[in-house]
Structure formats: C-alpha cells, structure tokens
C-alpha cells in the first residue's frame, strides 16, 4: 500500500507566506483598502503553522515561530503604533491610544488563531506564557510603560475640568481607564499604582482648596449642600468611567477634606451650626448633617452631644418656667398640684414628641441619638417643680385625664395616645416606685369615690405600665381594679340578702366596698363612735359577710365612706352629701342644739386634727351648716357650735367638701419604708448566691438590681448592710473588714 509523503516546509519559505497574512491584517487595522480574510485564507495560514510545527526534527519550527509571533507585534508597535502616539497630546493622544489598544486586541485575537496550534501543544508542554498573554505584554512593555505618565496626567486634568463644571467625553475616559485594568489581566496593580494613587492625591488637593474657601464664606447649611453635591458627583464619576473599586477610596478622600478636617468648625458655626439648626427647627439641614457625618468615623458623636445639650436646655427652661409660675401662686395654694403643673407635663410630652420625631426622621433612629435623648430627658425629668417631684406630677397628670370632670377634655383616642406618652416619660424617671405609690393613691380615690371616667382606660394604662416596668410594678394596681368588680358582685348579693331577711333591714340604703388589704394603700382605721343608725348597718353587713366566708376579718375604714343625709332647715330640706365622719358629727346635733369643741371630740372619739378639719368644713367654709362662736375662720378648743337652722341655698342637693389630708408626706414615708425592705431583700439575694463579696461590688450589684424602680442612695445601702450584720444575715470578714460573708 502506497504512503503519501508530506512536503517539508522550511522556515524562510513558511514565514514568508505567514508574513503576507500578517501584512494583510495590519493593512485592515490601519484602515487601508484590503479585502477581509476568507475562510480559505484563514485555513491556509493555520495549516501552514500546523505543518511547520508537526514536521520531524530538525524541521519542527515551534520555538522559532513562537519567537516570530512576538516579533510581529514588536515590529508593528515600533513602526506604526508608537510614532502615531508620540505625535499627539492630551485628549487627541487619549483617542489614539484607545484606537490603538482596540486594534491591538484584534491583532492578538487573529494572530492567536493563526498560531493556535502552538497554544495547544508547544506552549502547554513547555509551560510558556500563552499567545494572547504574549500579545498583551508586548503592548504593555512597549506602549503602556512609555506613555502611562502622560495618560494619567491627561485623564486627571479632564476629571478636574469636569469638577469645575466643564463637559468632557466620559466614554473616552471610560475606555482609557479600561486599558489600565485590562493591562493587568487579573491584577488591579497597574490601575491602582499608575492611576488611582495619583487621582486620590489630586482629589485630596482639589477639595482641600475648595474647603478652605467654603468654610470661611458659606453658612453651615450651604457648605453641607455643596459637600453633599460633591459626594454625589464623585459617585457618578465612578459609575461613568472609574473602576468600581475606586468608589470607597475616592469618597473617603472627599469626606476627609470636606468633613473630617472641618467637622468642629462646621458644627459650631455661630449663626448656622448645629445649635442654630436645632433652635430653628431646620429638619432638612439636620437630616443632611446626619447623612454627611454618619459617613465619617465617630462623626456623629459631636452631633449627638450638641443634640443632647440642646434638648437638656429646652427641658430645663420648661422646668424653670414652671418653677416661676409656681412661685407666683398664692401661698395657701402652693401645696396643691394645679393647672400650671399640668401645663408643664403637657409641654414635656410635646417636647418629647418633637425630639423623638427628630431622632426617627432626621437621625434615622441611630442609637447615639436615642441615647442622647434619654440622657437629656433624665436630667430635667428628675427635677421637681415647687416641691412636687416629677413622679407626683406625672401621677397627677394621669389622674386628671382618667377622672370624671378632670381638666383634660380629650377624646378616647387622644386619652390612649396621651397615656402612652406619659408611660414613655416614666422611663426617664429614676423614682418609679414613688410614681407607683402616688398613682396608687389617686387610683384608689378614683375607684372608691366613683371618679373614674372609664374602666377601659384604667386597664389600658396598667397594661402599658406593665410592659414598661414589669408585672411587679402593676400587680397591686391590677388587684385594686379587680377588687372593685368583685365588690359590685358582693353588693348585689348583700342587697339580695336584705330582701330575703327583711327583719335585718337597717332602714338605710347601705353600700359596702370590700377590699383586699395587700392591694390598697394603707389607711388609718379609727374607732370612731358611730351613730346608732350606722352601728346597726355595720352589724347587718357583718352578719351577711359571715355567711359568705368564715376566715376573713373585716377592718372598717370609715374615713373613706360617704353618706347622704337630709337636713331640715327653716327655709327647706336640703340633701347633704358628706363623708361618714362629717355625717357622724352632724348627727350629734339631732339631740342637742349646742356643743362645745371638747364635747364633740369626746363624743366622736377622733383625733384633734381630724375634728378641726371636720368642723372647719362645716362651719368656716362655703356651706356653713354649723354656726360657731366666736365667728372667725379658725377652729380653737374654746369654740362652741350649733346647728345653723337659718342656712339655705338655691340647690336642693349639696356636696360638702372635706379637703383631703396632704398625702405627699405619707406617700414619701411609705416609699422610704418599702425601699428599705427592697434594699434588704436585694442584699440578701446577692449574698446568698455569691456567699462572699467586697463592699464596693455588693453596692454596685445592689444599685443595678434596684435601678429599674429607684436609684438607691449609697449611704442607705451602707446603713442596710450594717443593719443586716446586726441581725446576723451577714458578717464582716475577719481579715478584711471591706468584705462580707453570708450567714445561712
């Protein structure tokens, strides 16, 4: 069988053929008239290389062809590309460079195809750089290295022109900068070292000069508008022609020059800085300030400090305003928490609403500003007004909203909203236990004297308080509200009992409210000498109650009772609504016309203070049911009283007020007592788990445990520790008196 021998191609002959193809390619690239490569042309060129590489040695020309491949590029670059670049400058040079780079990539693509066989076998066996890589490195080493400096300067010059507002060819810049990236193949080193570093330095210089002028000439809002616009423009620059990896570095440079360098000068500008923006409610400018300063490291800290100071000043001014208004009150009204204080709480709520909105909207709910707001409110929310603590003021404010006929006339929705806001303010008050006690006293009055406007609101605020302060805070109050519901049921059963035991009917309509001792504030229970009619009522109810339960003891709190009595005056009979104490005193005059002060005290068996209050309400106040000798405005032990039969009034039904005893002192005393117990319990709890602990640490843990309800005084804790030592709960360490041991 005959074999077909392939004709050997020698190097010169083969390369001459290849040269023709390469020249044709160069002509096409230079735009000279030349027909495109046909598939036959391509196959001929490819096959020539293939044959020259697969001939038996010494005619395998792979190594020589690999070198000639490189030389083809070097020759073309030296003869055509570099001269055309060297004769052009600035933008024209950049355009030429883009064209030349584009052509070069086409040339690499075509030549790599012609020489493809080298890539597949020769190169991989010898671990040599691939053809495309060789082609690119020729451009890098010969063209790029020579003109990179001029290119970088031309590009940066155009960028600065654009910064000054001139129109530039962004597409051209994008194409030029793509060369810096593509030259590095997979590495960004060329882009970063030969262009980006210079751009960043130029950017810093450019904005440094701008900032020096603007900080002197512009107001803070105008400066910020310019800074924001610059940052926006630089971001656009990245999107249009810089590499995305430059964005962060570029913006940081701009931020550093425009913001970091001038932060304090900008924030503290006299008539337009942060203080002024807060004072004038410039919310858009404050939002911009937040956006800008949140970009720089620790940039928001000074802003939040100024915000805190501003809110503190505003709140403190409200306290002073309320103090001034209170000091202008008449002396006898100073003790009563009145309308002025209500206005104060309302203003504090409005202040809180305003600055919570600032934190949310201007400062995007950032924790620094939440903290600043909290710390500011803690400063002035714990200042009292004319002897009333903020705990009392808040409790009184709630009372006014929740009681019938309070000074706050609001819709149901507005009431809910306001209560929500009061509970939020409570978070800033350190003496939450004091608020709880005042609130409980006032809740008791609302519930017991049917003053509560709406049960739903009463329960709703307790739910809010529970969420804010925990279940322990509201458990007693919830018990009080529940007691009233149970008491109504008791009353219905009592009325049923009377109707089935008519012989026990006392002849007086009697309503009794049974309360659970632990839930309610403590009240004094005096053994007042009740009139016979009332004694009978008490006995009948006792008998009924014993049919319901055997193990519960009733303690009667007559000081909280009310009574309706008919008083027959000469002109007409008037129904008087009085307290049980007032009724007991008036009923003494059913049998006699005149009674001396001392006789009244003896017959009622009450304290002098109580009797003076009662007599004052009936003989010296608006409705003089009793007349007294001497006829003056104060009660003394030598006075004599008689029923004023001449009394009359246009109404047939009168409520005779009895001014309440000032409960403030009692509330504070009760809270102090509870605090002592709470500190004791906390110390014992801590020591029980720790067994041995130093004084300082015990105090700190105690403060932390109790901080949710009140701020315990260090001296008070020390005192309680001493007391627990004397009661053998703790002992001092023998070697170190500053260390305590728990005694089981």
Swiss-Prot record:
Keywords: Ubl conjugation, Ubl conjugation pathway. GO terms for cellular component: cullin-RING ubiquitin ligase complex. Induction: Induced by abscisic acid, heat shock, salt stress and drought stress. It comes from the Eukaryota. InterPro entries: Cullin, Cullin_CS, Cullin_homology, Cullin_homology_sf, Cullin_N, Cullin_neddylation_domain, Cullin_repeat-like_dom_sf, WH-like_DNA-bd_sf. One of its GO terms (biological process) is ubiquitin-dependent protein catabolic process. Part of a SCF (SKP1-CUL1-F-box protein) E3 ubiquitin-protein ligase complex. Is able to form the SCF complex together with SKP1 and the rice black streaked dwarf virus RBSDV protein P7-2. Interacts with D3. The keyword Nucleotide-binding does not apply. Expressed in dry seeds and coleoptiles. This is Cullin-1. PROSITE patterns: CULLIN_1, CULLIN_2. Involved in ubiquitination and subsequent proteasomal degradation of target proteins. Residues 674-736 form the Cullin neddylation domain. Belongs to the cullin family. GO terms for molecular function: ubiquitin protein ligase binding. Gene3D superfamilies: Cullin Repeats, Cullin, Chain C, Domain 2, Winged helix-like DNA-binding domain superfamily/Winged helix DNA-binding domain. Neddylated (rubylated). Deneddylation occurs upon interaction with the COP9 signalosome (CSN) complex.
């Amino acid at each position: 069988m005959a074999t077909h021998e392939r004709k050997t191609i020698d190097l010169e002959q083969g390369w001459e053929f290849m040269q023709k193809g390469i020249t044709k390619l160069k002509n096409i690239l230079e735009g000279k008239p030349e027909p495109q490569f046909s598939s036959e042309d391509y196959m001929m060129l490819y096959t020539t290389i293939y044959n020259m590489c697969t001939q038996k040695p010494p005619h395998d020309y792979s190594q020589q062809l690999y070198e000639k491949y490189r030389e083809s590029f070097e020759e073309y670059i030296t003869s055509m590309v570099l001269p055309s670049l060297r004769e052009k400058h600035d933008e024209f040079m950049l355009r030429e460079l883009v064209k030349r780079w584009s052509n070069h990539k086409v040339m690499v693509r075509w030549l790599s195809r012609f020489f493809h066989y080298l890539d597949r076998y020769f190169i991989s066996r010898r671990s040599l750089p691939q053809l495309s890589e060789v082609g690119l490195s020729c451009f890098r080493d010969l063209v790029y290295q020579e003109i990179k400096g001029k290119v970088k300067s031309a590009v940066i010059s155009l960028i600065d022109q654009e910064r000054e507002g001139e129109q530039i060819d962004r597409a051209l810049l994008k194409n030029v900068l793509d060369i810096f990236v593509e030259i590095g193949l997979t590495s960004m080193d060329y882009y970063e070292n030969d262009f980006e570093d210079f751009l960043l330095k130029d950017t810093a210089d450019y904005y440094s000069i701008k900032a020096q002028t603007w900080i002197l000439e512009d107001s803070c809002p105008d400066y910020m508008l310019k800074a924001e616009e610059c940052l926006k423009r630089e971001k656009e620059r990245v999107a249009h022609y810089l590499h995305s990896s430059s964005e962060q570095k570029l913006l940081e440079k701009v931020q550093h020059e425009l913001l970091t360098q001038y932060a304090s000068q900008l924030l503290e500008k006299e008539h337009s800085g942060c203080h002024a923006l807060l004072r004038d409610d410039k919310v858009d400018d404050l939002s911009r300030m937040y956006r800008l300063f949140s970009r720089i490291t620790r940039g928001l800290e000074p802003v939040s400090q100024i915000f805190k100071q501003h809110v503190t000043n505003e709140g403190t001014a409200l306290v002073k305003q309320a103090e001034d208004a209170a000091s202008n009150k008449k002396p006898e009204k100073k003790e009563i928490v009145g309308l002025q204080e209500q206005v104060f709480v309302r203003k504090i709520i409005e202040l809180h609403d305003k600055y919570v909105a600032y934190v949310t909207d201007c400062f995007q709910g950032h924790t620094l500003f939440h903290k600043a707001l909290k710390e500011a409110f803690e400063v002035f929310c714990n200042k009292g007004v004319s002897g009333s603590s903020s705990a009392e003021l808040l409790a009184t404010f709630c009372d006014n909203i929740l009681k019938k006929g309070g000074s706050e006339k609001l819709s149901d929705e507005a009431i809910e909203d306001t209560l929500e806001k009061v509970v939020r303010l409570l978070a800033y008050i350190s003496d939450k236990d004091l608020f709880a006690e005042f609130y409980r006293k006032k809740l008791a009055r609302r519930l017991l004297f049917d003053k509560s406007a709406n049960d739903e609101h009463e329960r709703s605020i307790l739910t809010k308080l529970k969420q804010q302060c925990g279940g322990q805070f509201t458990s007693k109050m919830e018990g009080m509200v529940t007691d009233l519901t149970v008491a109504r049921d008791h009353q219905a059963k009592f009325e049923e009992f009377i109707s089935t035991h008519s012989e026990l009917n006392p002849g007086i309509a009697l309503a009794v409210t049974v309360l659970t001792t632990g839930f309610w504030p403590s009240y004094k229970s005096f053994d007042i000498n009740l009139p016979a009619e009332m004694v009978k009522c008490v006995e009948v109810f006792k008998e009924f109650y014993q049919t319901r339960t055997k193990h519960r003891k009733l303690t009667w709190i007559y000081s909280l009772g009310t009574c309706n009595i008919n008083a027959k005056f000469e002109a007409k009979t008037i129904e008087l609504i009085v307290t049980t104490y007032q009724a007991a005193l008036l009923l003494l005059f059913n049998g006699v016309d005149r009674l001396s002060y001392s006789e009244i005290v003896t017959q009622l068996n009450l304290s002098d203070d109580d009797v003076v209050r009662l007599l004052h309400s009936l003989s010296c106040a608006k409705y003089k049911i009793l007349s007294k000798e001497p006829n003056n405005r104060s009660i003394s032990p030598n006075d004599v009283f008689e029923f004023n039969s001449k009394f009359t009034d246009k109404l047939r039904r009168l409520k005779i007020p009895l001014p309440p005893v000032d409960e403030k002192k009692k509330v504070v005393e009760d809270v102090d007592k509870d605090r002592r117990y709470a500190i004791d319990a906390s110390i014992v709890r801590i020591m029980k788990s720790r067994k041995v602990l130093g004084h300082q640490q015990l105090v700190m843990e105690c403060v932390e445990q109790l901080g949710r309800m009140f701020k315990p005084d260090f001296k008070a804790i020390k005192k309680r520790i001493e007391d627990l030592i004397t009661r053998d709960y703790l002992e001092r360490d023998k070697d170190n008196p500053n260390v305590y041991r728990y005694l089981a």
